[in-house]
């Protein structure tokens, strides 16, 4: 029995198929990866967060996009659909169709069991190469927890010596408030998780900080 032959597509072929497909798929290195459906809890958390961002940023020059807008990571050729995107400069798109954003400022992912490893690892490693990106937030759907990575100023005498550092702040508990300083806004976890129910209550709250250097512990390729 012969092994099943993989079919590889060019980015142009992927986009042609994607724009007429009934479901969304991601693209990387010639391969297409169908996206799984989301749980009601995942959808509610993403909706709450989007609504909160839209209201908070209403009078500011920032736009909030849902998971229907693709993002392209130009350095690697990854096409993906973050759960929530914030763009605060004039949007730059991959082509005149204006359905693939190149310059997100903030990317937010609501974690799912099937995507958490990739969102924390390979996908974040690629997101970090987007020059416009300043903030990356991971929102748990299993407990009240928001992990917020913030790009720090590069250090080094030359571009070759510079190291991009990302500061992690973890907000846990419904009485905590996530702060996105680059946007000048606060996101109360009680509003992010409004009407979200868990089998067991999560007690306590805390804020943790740790610095990670670019490239550490992110080796898995996106799937």
Question: What are the residue ranges of the model-derived segments?
Answer:
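Gly/Pro/Ser/Thr-rich low-complexity, intrinsically disordered segments predominantly at protein N-termini
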Residues: 1-223
């Amino acid at each position: 029995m012969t092994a099943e032959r993989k079919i590889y597509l060019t980015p142009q072929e992927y986009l042609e198929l994607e724009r007429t497909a009934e479901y969304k798929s991601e693209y990387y290195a010639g391969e297409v990866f169908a996206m799984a459906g989301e749980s009601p809890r995942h959808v509610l958390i993403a909706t709450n967060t989007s609504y909160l961002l839209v209201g908070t940023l209403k009078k500011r020059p920032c736009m909030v996009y849902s998971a229907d807008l693709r993002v392209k990571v130009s350095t690697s050729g990854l096409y993906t659909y973050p759960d929530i995107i914030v763009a605060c400069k004039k949007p730059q798109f991959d082509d005149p169709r204006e359905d693939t954003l190149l310059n997100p400022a903030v990317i937010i992912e609501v974690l799912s069991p099937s995507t958490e490893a990739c969102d924390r690892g390979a996908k974040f490693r690629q997101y970090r190469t987007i020059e416009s990106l300043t903030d990356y937030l991971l929102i748990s759907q299993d407990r009240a927890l928001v992990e917020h990575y913030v790009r720090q100023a590069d250090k080094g005498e030359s571009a070759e010596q510079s190291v991009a550092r990302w500061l992690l702040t973890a907000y846990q508990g419904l009485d905590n408030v996530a702060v996105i300083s680059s946007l000048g806004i606060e996101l109360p976890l009680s509003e992010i998780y409004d009407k979200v129910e868990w089998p067991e209550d999560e007690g306590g709250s805390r804020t943790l900080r740790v610095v990670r250097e670019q490239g550490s512990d992110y080796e898995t390729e996106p799937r």
